[in-house]
Amino acid sequence: MAISYQLEQTSSESRARLGKLKTPRGEIQTPVFMPVGTQATVKTMTPEELKNLDAEIILGNTYHLHLRPGNDIVREADGLHKFMNWDRPILTDSGGFQVFSLGKLRQISEQGVEFRSHIDGSKLFMTPEKSIEIQEDLGSDIMMVFDECPPYPAEYDYVKESMDRTIRWSKRCLQHQKHPEKQALFGIVQGGMYPELRKESALKTTELDFPGYAVGGLSVGEPKEMMLEVLNTTIPYLPEEKPRYLMGVGTPDYIIEAVRMGIDMFDCVYPTRVARNGTAMTRFGNLTVRNAVFQRDFQPIEEDCDCYVCQNYSRAYLRHLIKANEILGFRLLTWHNLFFLIKLIKELRQAIADDNFLAWRDSFYKNYQN
């Protein structure tokens, strides 16, 4: 078995839980946030800096790395870890979400998806088998099944057909996997915003006995209340002894609520993307540093933050860098945002360990506005 999960503690007042995910490249404390390294880099950060921020695992993107530089080149480099000089665990997504969100003029069949590259318009065909082959070339520690991610909103019949297809594709991924002892393969629960389809997907996916399970197809434009309601009805059908991963979620309030419901793993481009838009994440909510109000503001992003950025630079300087389109500005805001989110997860874990998660959550929300 490539990974093993150990449930260590469950909150007495919610479904929040602490665990350890053991992989060939190290142990991960859960809950955990995974910074996204789409193109074999977490934008503007070096692997060494990510380690200093205590990032335990990062995410790589199958679709993007297949198109550029090509999974054959990554394989020749002896895998993604060597290629990007990262010796901690890596999770790769299956490329499914990107095929459905970025791929132009896509055509879905039982075999797979035909689409056009968002880079040069060339015609490509992705199948469950192809996705697994690419992820095996990349050499990630955790792979994901190739799934169909339906849009929001979508009609019941379409989502049902899509969900059934994802189950069939999941079986094909399992059958095509060559080295389950080296690389874990997680299943993905779909079903759109329909609780009965989510239940059906969860039950059928868990029958396939994956070492971990993701909840996909959420945070795709639906209202927050709907997303949390669907998540809450899905999680009870996932086994307690396996890790649970909520795909594409990375704001503090969503993470806290999902942890309360029993989610262990998160990934999102949010902290790095908003940094490049000139926004800093804080425990009081987002701070749009590029705004004119910070032109003469010489205090740090957060007074009590002990990250490198807050210890050394002012809001005024960061605003100047962002307005001047200087790379350092985007880099420093990315640094702060990742530090903030990883530290938040550490505090959250400590609150679960102390069995006062709900009190900690209420205290956080008193200040936080988003």
From Swiss-Prot:
UniProt GO molecular function: metal ion binding; tRNA-guanosine(34) queuine transglycosylase activity
Transferase listed as a keyword: yes
Cofactor-binding details, from the entry: Binds 1 zinc ion per subunit.
RNA binding: region residues: 248-254, 272-276
Swiss-Prot/TrEMBL keywords: Glycosyltransferase, Metal-binding, Queuosine biosynthesis, Transferase, tRNA processing, Zinc
Binding site residues for Zn(2+): 305, 307, 310, 336
Known catalytic reactions: 7-aminomethyl-7-carbaguanine + guanosine(34) in tRNA = 7-aminomethyl-7-carbaguanosine(34) in tRNA + guanine
Role description: Catalyzes the base-exchange of a guanine (G) residue with the queuine precursor 7-aminomethyl-7-deazaguanine (PreQ1) at position 34 (anticodon wobble position) in tRNAs with GU(N) anticodons (tRNA-Asp, -Asn, -His and -Tyr). Catalysis occurs through a double-displacement mechanism. The nucleophile active site attacks the C1' of nucleotide 34 to detach the guanine base from the RNA, forming a covalent enzyme-RNA intermediate. The proton acceptor active site deprotonates the incoming PreQ1, allowing a nucleophilic attack on the C1' of the ribose to form the product.
Name assigned to this protein: Queuine tRNA-ribosyltransferase
Species annotation: Natranaerobius thermophilus (strain ATCC BAA-1301 / DSM 18059 / JW/NM-WN-LF)
Primary gene name: tgt
